[in-house]
Amino acid sequence: MAANKSYKSYFLDPLWNNNQPLIAILGICSALAVTTTVNTALTMGLAVSFVTGCSSFFVSLLRKVTPDSVRMITQLIIISLFVIVIDQFLKAFFFDISKTLSVFVGLIITNCIVMGRAESLARNVPPIPAFLDGFASGLGYGWVLVTVSIIREFFGFGTILGLQLIPKCFYASEAHPDGYENFGLMVLAPSAFFLLGIMIWGVNILRSKKERR
């Protein structure tokens, strides 16, 4: 498998052609919870990229000495190690974001993308392609999260990355009762579900049109 694909293909395929949330429909549950703001979505995307890339690398590195009978538990131990590392890193250097993400950083271990890449690819290819695929799978997951979070934060709070983009003077007040009001639905998890559904639908349309050509 490794001989037939370039490093470039291993990195680029998960970003679009084999995007895990949009094509494989994986990692959807956490996407509903962490896309309220761009900060949390970006942090989660980078955290998953780190965990998936590093765990895939070590799963591949140990693939020839890992018996099939303990394959899954070995993968879980490796993934857990890197989840703990990123969780402690966020608590030490980005405490506010870590507090906002709460248990969802620890729940990266249950993210189907991480185990999926380790099981379906990392144990079958050398370490470098495994790392590139894992890291890019996380980035592919991350850009989907960020896209959803930009829409949710802008319409839900009027901000992007905490910066106020909709001027305060546009908002409803006693002097201007008919002014703008934030779209409260965007703050709720169902909005992420519908936005992801629209993105998946759009990607499927683009792929079907491309296949017809």
Curated annotation (Swiss-Prot):
The chain crosses the membrane at residues 21-41, 42-62, 77-97, 101-121, 131-151, 153-173, 183-203. It is an enzyme of class 7 (translocase). It catalyses: a ubiquinone + n Na(+)(in) + NADH + H(+) = a ubiquinol + n Na(+)(out) + NAD(+). One of its GO terms (biological process) is sodium ion transport. Its main location: membrane. This is Na(+)-translocating NADH-quinone reductase subunit D. One of its GO terms (cellular component) is plasma membrane. The gene is nqrD. It is a multi-pass membrane protein. Composed of six subunits; NqrA, NqrB, NqrC, NqrD, NqrE and NqrF. It comes from Chlamydia abortus (strain DSM 27085 / S26/3). It is found in: Cell inner membrane. NQR complex catalyzes the reduction of ubiquinone-1 to ubiquinol by two successive reactions, coupled with the transport of Na(+) ions from the cytoplasm to the periplasm. NqrA to NqrE are probably involved in the second step, the conversion of ubisemiquinone to ubiquinol. NCBIfam families: nqrD (TIGR01939), PRK09292.1 (NF006777), PRK12405.1 (NF009070). Signal peptide: none annotated. HAMAP family: NqrD (MF_00428). Keywords: Cell inner membrane, Cell membrane, Ion transport, Membrane, NAD, Sodium, Sodium transport, Translocase, Transmembrane, Transmembrane helix, Transport, Ubiquinone. Pfam families: Rnf-Nqr. Its EC number is 7.2.1.1.
